[in-house]
């Protein structure tokens, strides 16, 4: 059986010398797939994503990307390997224009990135319209599109999003999810942490429900939405 494109396998660890937050947690994503991590507050969702990105030290387990063990690489080196990461907050330069923000995303590129910029504008048409506007003047949903677009400028092999719909209205959330689906259709696998579990699972090829840093449930998005225990405990019935 072929290994998933990305796998954080049996990850155990926490921040610095503190207690473990993750306990044998496994997260995997295939090419072109949307995988979401959901669960209650304090479940370790964002911690699991940060572990995959190298922002905390694992005591046990490993992270492999496209068959390579990247467990000992820094976040910067993981970006060079093909990881794109969009944090939940402070993810744009508010005083720069939209286009300047996107061009900042190409900082590791040594080639002509104009074609990639056009692809980002095709995925996020509102950014083309507002490309000369200061990013700080945009709405919350538009700022998130800038942040995702900037990550795409690195031509990542994998895109990770930490609560991309935090603080936006339901209508904007639906639009962001539509854009995320469009990104996945280009072949880029997406790993996403979401508080809006029901909506996230509805677009997910694969879902992971974490509880206290452990895998509680996993399966396709549809399977988890139809699981009575998941619905009762995490989706409000």
Labelled PLM ranges:
Residues 2-237:
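Glycine-rich phosphate-binding loops of nucleotide-dependent enzymes
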């Amino acid at each position: 059986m072929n290994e998933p494109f990305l796998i954080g396998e049996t990850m155990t660890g926490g921040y610095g010398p503190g207690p473990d937050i993750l306990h044998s947690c496994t997260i995997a994503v295939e090419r072109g797939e949307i995988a979401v991590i959901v669960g209650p507050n304090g479940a370790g969702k964002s911690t699991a994503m940060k572990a995959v990105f190298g922002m905390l030290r694992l005591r046990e387990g490993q992270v492999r990307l496209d068959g390579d063990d990247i467990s000992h690489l820094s976040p910067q080196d993981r970006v060079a390997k093909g990881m794109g990461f969009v944090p939940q907050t402070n993810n744009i330069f508010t005083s720069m224009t939209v286009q300047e923000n996107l061009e900042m995303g190409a900082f590791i590129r040594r080639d002509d990135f104009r074609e990639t910029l056009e692809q980002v504008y095709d995925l996020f048409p509102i950014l083309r319209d507002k490309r000369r506007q200061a990013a700080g003047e945009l709405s919350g949903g538009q700022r998130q599109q800038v942040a995702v677009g900037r990550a795409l400028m690195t031509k990542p092999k994998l895109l990770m999003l930490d609560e991309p719909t935090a603080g936006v209205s339901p209508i904007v959330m639906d639009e962001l999810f539509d854009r995320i689906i469009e990104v996945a259709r280009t072949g880029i696998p997406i790993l996403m942490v979401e508080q809006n579990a029901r909506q996230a699972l509805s677009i997910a090829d694969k879902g992971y429900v974490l509880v206290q840093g452990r895998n509680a449930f996993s399966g396709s998005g549809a399977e988890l939405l139809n699981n009575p225990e998941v619905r009762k405990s995490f989706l409000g019935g």
